[in-house]
């Protein structure tokens, strides 16, 4: 391993790329000189100062965004790809096998080629180790890895909410997920339906009835721990806030609350970024903003025979950039929690 790890961020002008840079600037390896931020790249914004896009990143404000191409990214020890879906695969193929590539896009998340082609409409590029360390067995696959696929933000929330119950066979393999999210999850490109006048004071569902691209990813993660095919009904809802996801997940169960609570305590007791709420308390997005934490609550609707599991995360941290840095730490053999906080910014 190099004495100083040179890190590049492709797609640095976007929200995910900017959040990766924010976390890297606060990483102890950066403060100690063991991690250096190299190329920061963009597409249409290439040639402009990073500070025009992320004025909060003052230590890097004068950095000029370079074009996103393999020649610019070559020679770095770690490359974060924060690119639109479908753009990572070709670029990754041009980088060396020894380069740690952490892809925040969807290109390598799905193992099922047919599912990829159905939801994304292009040839499947393959799959990489999945960057959700809390998934059973994931840490072993991430340690020493040189290719990592960061999970989607909605799947992160839904999987963390449901994994313990599904892994212990305490719920039926048919789940419903309704998740509200802020506008940053849609990226930074200008869109009419994301204008302030369209979003403020309003909430709307979108990509309903199995149409959202994160649906097969949620099903894949649940199937991996249950050993059964899992059906997922997923409804995303856009709300007028910039950050945060609150996922309310339900599934049929005959298990008593005590058994379900015990399963969650067993699964998450030693997890550094998971906070299982005390009984009677419920997660809120405001408590996790800016942190890599996931706050989770579990309850049973006894009259309906339904598990209700709720997860709150910051979609830009635990849902993207934080998971990317957490996975980088594992891949490099560094303490998993370095550079990541469980303390949110409130109010």
Curated annotation (Swiss-Prot):
The highest taxon in the source lineage is: Bacteria
The EC number(s) this enzyme carries: 1.2.1.38
The record's InterPro entries line, in alphabetical order, gives:
AGPR_AS (IPR023013), AGPR_type-1 (IPR000706), NAD(P)-bd_dom_sf (IPR036291), NAGSA_dehydrogenase (IPR050085), Semialdehyde_DH_NAD-bd (IPR000534)
What are the recorded Gene Ontology BP terms? L-arginine biosynthetic process
The reaction(s) catalysed by this protein are: N-acetyl-L-glutamate 5-semialdehyde + phosphate + NADP(+) = N-acetyl-L-glutamyl 5-phosphate + NADPH + H(+)
State the Gene3D superfamilies in the record.
Answer: Dihydrodipicolinate Reductase, domain 2 (3.30.360.10), NAD(P)-binding Rossmann-like Domain (3.40.50.720)
Report the locations given in the UniProt record: Cytoplasm
Q: In which pathway does it act?
A: Amino-acid biosynthesis; L-arginine biosynthesis; N(2)-acetyl-L-ornithine from L-glutamate: step 3/4
**Which molecular-function annotation in GO is an example for this chain?**
N-acetyl-gamma-glutamyl-phosphate reductase activity
Provide the alphabetized UniProt keywords: Amino-acid biosynthesis, Arginine biosynthesis, Cytoplasm, NADP, Oxidoreductase
What does the entry list under GO cellular component?
Answer: cytoplasm
Catalytic residues (positions): 153
What the protein does?
Catalyzes the NADPH-dependent reduction of N-acetyl-5-glutamyl phosphate to yield N-acetyl-L-glutamate 5-semialdehyde.
Matching entries from PANTHER family are given as: N-ACETYL-GAMMA-GLUTAMYL-PHOSPHATE REDUCTASE, CHLOROPLASTIC-RELATED, N-ACETYL-GAMMA-GLUTAMYL-PHOSPHATE REDUCTASE, CHLOROPLASTIC-RELATED-RELATED
Family the entry assigns = Belongs to the NAGSA dehydrogenase family. Type 1 subfamily.
Q: What name goes with this protein?
A: N-acetyl-gamma-glutamyl-phosphate reductase
Q: Which organism is it from?
A: Mycolicibacterium paratuberculosis (strain ATCC BAA-968 / K-10)
């Amino acid at each position: 391993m190099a004495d100083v790890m040179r890190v590049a961020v492709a797609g640095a002008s976007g929200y995910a790329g900017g959040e990766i840079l924010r976390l890297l600037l606060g990483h102890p390896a950066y403060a100690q000189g063991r991690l250096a931020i190299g190329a920061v790249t963009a597409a249409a914004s290439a040639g402009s100062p990073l500070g025009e896009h992320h004025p909060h990143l003052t230590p890097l404000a004068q950095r000029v965004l370079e074009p996103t191409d393999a020649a610019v990214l070559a020679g770095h020890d770690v490359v974060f790809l924060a690119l639109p879906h479908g753009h990572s695969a070709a670029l990754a193929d041009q980088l060396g096998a020894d380069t740690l590539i952490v892809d925040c896009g969807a290109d390598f998340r799905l193992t099922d080629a047919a599912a990829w082609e159905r939801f994304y409409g292009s040839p499947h590029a393959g799959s990489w180790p999945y960057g959700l360390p809390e998934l059973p067995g994931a840490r072993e696959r991430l340690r020493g890895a040189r290719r990592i696929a960061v999970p989607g933000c909605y799947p992160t929330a839904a999987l963390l909410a449901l994994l313990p119950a599904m892994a212990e066979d305490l719920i039926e393999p048919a789940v419903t997920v309704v998740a509200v999210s802020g506008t940053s999850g849609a990226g930074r490109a200008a869109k009419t339906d994301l204008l302030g006048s369209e979003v403020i004071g309003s909430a709307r569902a979108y990509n309903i009835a199995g149409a959202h691209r994160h649906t097969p990813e949620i099903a894949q993660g649940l199937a991996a721990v249950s050993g059964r095919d899992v059906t997922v009904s997923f409804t995303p809802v856009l709300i007028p806030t910039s950050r945060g996801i609150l996922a309310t997940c339900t599934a049929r169960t005959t298990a008593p609350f005590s058994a379900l609570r015990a399963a969650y305590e067993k699964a998450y007791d030693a997890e550094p970024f998971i906070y299982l709420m005390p009984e009677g308390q419920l997660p809120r997005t405001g408590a996790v903003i800016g942190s890599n934490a996931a706050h989770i609550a579990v309850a049973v609707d006894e009259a309906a025979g339904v598990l209700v599991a709720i997860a709150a995360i910051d979609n830009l941290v635990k849902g993207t950039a934080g998971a990317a840095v957490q996975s980088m730490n594992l891949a490099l053999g560094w303490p998993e929690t370095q550079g990541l906080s469980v303390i949110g910014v409130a109010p």
